[in-house]
């Protein structure tokens, strides 16, 4: 079939913008007898056809410059042309010939495994799908893995985790909704174009479905990026709130004060008993294992850098001495028997509560009750703080060379006289 459909022929069979051109003699738009009028082309067949092709190409190049009204008018003229069915049948024949190659390229592509992993993770974390409390389940699992009971601090952290996870979920769903809306709008636009073109050229329903799948595959890159960023945000949130290996949290200031006070008041033997650990754990609001770990770390740090902790030891020693003297003035109970811990011996001042001040004698014996009373009266109402001066309460010489702990030596500010063990004087010469 040599006929080509360009539009309704102009009146009088002349050459128009849209006409039905035929290469056969006597065809529309060509004078009878064949060839060019008057034999201008020397009887060469096809000369007029080359000119027609040039006109067609020129019209195609000017399509973009046409207004909407002009385009609608030419589309209507094409649909109403008497040769439209013939043109459509030719296009269907061509479509059947090329249909095999199109069908061979329509193989279903497998789902991206990375996208499947992202979807599974978002479902497990409670971000994707219906809200089922995935954040609460993750928080409970992390609490169980980190050691059992949920402390108030942990409950606050889990509440923060759930609120931030809900915020991530809200952002994810809002962005996913925008993505789906844009994808649906573009798909609808393309489907409308294909339906409009199906009036001119044959477009099968399967081809429309294939085009929709291509559009979705193009948009899937945006979807994958959104899910990837959401998964990264969830992982960062988990590592910050629920990871058991995260950076340890420091104790409260009050708990640290209590532990340091006990450590420096028992510097000669900083190994609290199980009863003392339980008491300290109750005071600090922590577990017994945390108390044990704190004392173990504190002993190691103190041995490694005694000079650095000497000033801190003096501060807590003064606090302990002041608390002891204030307790002695407020209560008049008799002093307790000397403690037998350590080789040097020590005595306990009554009224000191849980804090004890170990003060061995120079000869290795413990002070008697009369010596304690004499020492207390020699201190005067000013307490230890007035009589200690600038001397150090605890000396680095308290530890043996092999790293083991022993009883503290007599403080430099309190010395035993040489004339006899019956009296104790305060030495403020330093």
UniProtKB/Swiss-Prot annotation:
Pfam families: Homeobox_KN, PBC. Signal peptide: none annotated. Keywords: Activator, DNA-binding, Homeobox, Nucleus, Phosphoprotein, Transcription, Transcription regulation. The modification Phosphoserine is found at residues 136, 151, 159, 330, 395. Residues 13-48, 380-392 have a biased composition (Gly residues). GO terms for cellular component: chromatin; nucleus; transcription regulator complex. One of its GO terms (molecular function) is DNA-binding transcription factor activity, RNA polymerase II-specific. Ubiquitously expressed. This is Pre-B-cell leukemia transcription factor 2. It comes from Homo sapiens. The lineage of its organism: Eukaryota, Metazoa, Chordata, Craniata, Vertebrata.
């Amino acid at each position: 079939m040599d006929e080509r459909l360009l539009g309704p022929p102009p009146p009088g069979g002349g050459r128009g913008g849209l006409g039905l051109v035929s290469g056969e003699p006597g065809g529309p738009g060509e004078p009878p007898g064949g060839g060019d009028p008057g034999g201008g082309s020397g009887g060469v067949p096809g000369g007029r056809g080359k000119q027609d092709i040039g006109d067609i190409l020129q019209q195609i190049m000017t399509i973009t410059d046409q207004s909407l009204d002009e385009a609608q008018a030419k589309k209507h003229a094409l649909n109403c042309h008497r040769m439209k069915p013939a043109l459509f049948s030719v296009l269907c024949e061509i479509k059947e010939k090329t249909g095999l190659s199109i069908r061979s390229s329509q193989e279903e592509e497998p789902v991206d495994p990375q996208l499947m992993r992202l979807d599974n993770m978002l479902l497990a974390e409670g971000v994707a799908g219906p809200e089922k409390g995935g954040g609460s389940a993750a928080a409970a699992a992390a609490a169980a893995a980190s050691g059992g009971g949920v402390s108030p601090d942990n409950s606050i952290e889990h509440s923060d985790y759930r609120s931030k996870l809900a915020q991530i979920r809200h952002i994810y769903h809002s962005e996913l909704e925008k993505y789906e809306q844009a994808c649906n709008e573009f798909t609808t636009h393309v489907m409308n174009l294909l339906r409009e073109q199906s009036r001119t050229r044959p477009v099968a329903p399967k081809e429309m479905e294939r085009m929709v799948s291509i559009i979705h595959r193009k948009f899937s890159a945006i979807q994958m990026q959104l899910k990837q960023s959401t998964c990264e945000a969830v992982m960062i949130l988990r590592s910050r709130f629920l990871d058991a290996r995260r950076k340890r949290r420091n104790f409260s200031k009050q708990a640290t004060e209590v532990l340091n006070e006990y450590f420096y008041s028992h510097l000669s033997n900083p190994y609290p008993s199980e009863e003392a650990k339980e008491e300290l754990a109750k005071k600090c609001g922590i577990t017994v294992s945390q108390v044990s770990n704190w004392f173990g770390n504190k002993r190691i740090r103190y041995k490694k850098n005694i000079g650095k902790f000497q000033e801190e030891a003096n501060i807590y020693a003064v606090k302990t001495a002041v608390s002891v003297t204030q307790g002695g003035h407020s209560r008049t109970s008799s002093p307790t028997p000397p403690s037998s811990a350590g080789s040097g011996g020590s005595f306990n001042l009554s009224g000191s509560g849980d804090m004890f001040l170990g003060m061995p004698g120079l000869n290795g014996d413990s002070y008697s009750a009369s010596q304690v009373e004499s020492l207390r009266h020699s201190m005067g109402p000013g307490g230890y703080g007035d009589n200690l001066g600038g001397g150090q309460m605890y000396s680095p010489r308290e530890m043996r060379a092999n790293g083991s702990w022993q009883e503290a030596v007599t403080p430099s500010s309190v010395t035993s006289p040489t004339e006899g063990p019956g009296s104790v004087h305060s030495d403020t010469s330093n």
